[in-house]
Amino acid sequence: MPVIKVRENEPFDVALRRFKRSCEKAGILSEVRRREHYEKPTAERKRKKAAAVKRHMKKLSRDNARRVKLY
């Protein structure tokens, strides 16, 4: 769990914002949402494979767009 130290004369809102940012960087909320319900191993593999395919297609489209602009 992210820990922040409240600085002297620091407003509560600023400290809360820093805490939220550190939680977001650590990925706590996404982890909680992911673990909210049990996911079968086959469903997890399927989800991860779909994400990998999506990342690959996105990378390919970015590379193709770059090539078009260079010529």
Swiss-Prot record:
GO terms for molecular function: structural constituent of ribosome. It comes from the Bacteria. Keywords: Ribonucleoprotein, Ribosomal protein. One of its GO terms (cellular component) is ribonucleoprotein complex. InterPro entries: Ribosomal_bS21, Ribosomal_bS21_CS, Ribosomal_bS21_sf. Residues 37-71 are annotated as: Disordered. Residues 45-59 have a biased composition (Basic residues). The keyword Ribosomal protein applies. The keyword Metal-binding does not apply. GO terms for biological process: translation. Residues 60-71 have a biased composition (Basic and acidic residues). NCBIfam families: S21p. PANTHER family: MITOCHONDRIAL 28S RIBOSOMAL PROTEIN S21 (PTHR21109), SMALL RIBOSOMAL SUBUNIT PROTEIN BS21 (PTHR21109:SF22). Belongs to the bacterial ribosomal protein bS21 family. HAMAP family: Ribosomal_bS21 (MF_00358). This is Small ribosomal subunit protein bS21. It comes from Pseudoalteromonas translucida (strain TAC 125).
